[in-house]
């Protein structure tokens, strides 16, 4: 993420602050784009700056063949209308998370044959409302956080992603999957 900037220390938090701080103490920077390299140069960063492309996507394709198709309670992922939902960001806590839950319930009501896979963040601020809302819904598969290969396997087999994750916003389109970003 060298050189990626939103120019708002609070958004995303804490990622933007972390990127800026790390760029000041690092001597080697792997920028994904020329624009990112220019951001580093314009902010007075010293050290070697290499434009390398997106290492997240490199890792995705390096691991694609090893990706597992997780067994979600006997559900065959490729035969379902499957939506992968991932939500965890601070900006979505509280009322925003309740709005997301409301929207997911609308989808489930309208499209009764749709399944949702929802890995739950460990933070109880996110986890508890999801459990309360979906623990008894047979069309929602609540899981613990996925390891990387299971994550890739789930992305490969879903029809759509709904997420506030910056990483998933990059990975899913690289696999030809549509993404609805759950952020302001």
Language model: regions and residue ranges:
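A short, histidine- and acid-enriched strand-loop-helix "catalytic/donor-clamping" loop
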Residues: 1-13
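Short beta-strands and strand-loop turn motifs
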Residues: 1-4, 53, 84-87, 119, ...
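Short, ordered loop/turn segments at secondary-structure junctions
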Residues: 2-5, 34, 184
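Active-site loop-to-helix "anion-binding N-cap" substructures in soluble metabolic enzymes
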Residues: 10-22
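A nucleotide-sugar donor-handling region in carbohydrate enzymes
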Residues: 22-96
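A donor-sugar binding/catalytic signature common to diverse glycosyltransferases
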Residues: 29, 151-184
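Hydrophobic/aromatic beta-strand patches that form the interior of the parallel beta-sheet core
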Residues: 30, 50, 117, 141-143, ...
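Donor-nucleotide binding loops and adjacent catalytic segments primarily
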Residues: 67-157
């Amino acid at each position: 993420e060298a050189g990626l900037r939103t120019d708002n220390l609070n958004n995303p938090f804490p990622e933007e602050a972390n990127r800026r701080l790390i760029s000041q103490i690092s001597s080697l920077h792997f920028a994904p784009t020329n624009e990112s390299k220019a951001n580093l140069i314009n902010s007075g960063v010293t050290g070697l700056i290499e434009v390398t492309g997106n290492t997240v996507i490199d890792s995705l394709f390096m691991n694609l063949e090893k990706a597992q198709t997780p067994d979600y309670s006997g559900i065959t992922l490729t035969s379902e209308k499957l939506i992968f939902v991932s939500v965890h960001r601070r900006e979505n806590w509280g009322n925003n998370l309740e709005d997301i839950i409301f929207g997911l319930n609308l989808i489930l009501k309208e499209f009764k044959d749709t399944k949702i896979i929802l890995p739950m963040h460990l933070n109880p601020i996110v986890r508890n409302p999801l459990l309360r809302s979906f623990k008894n819904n047979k069309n929602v598969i609540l899981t613990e956080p996925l390891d990387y290969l299971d994550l890739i396997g789930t992305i490969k087999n879903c029809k759509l992603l709904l997420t506030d994750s910056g990483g998933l916003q990059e990975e899913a389109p690289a696999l030809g999957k549509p993404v609805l970003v759950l952020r302001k």
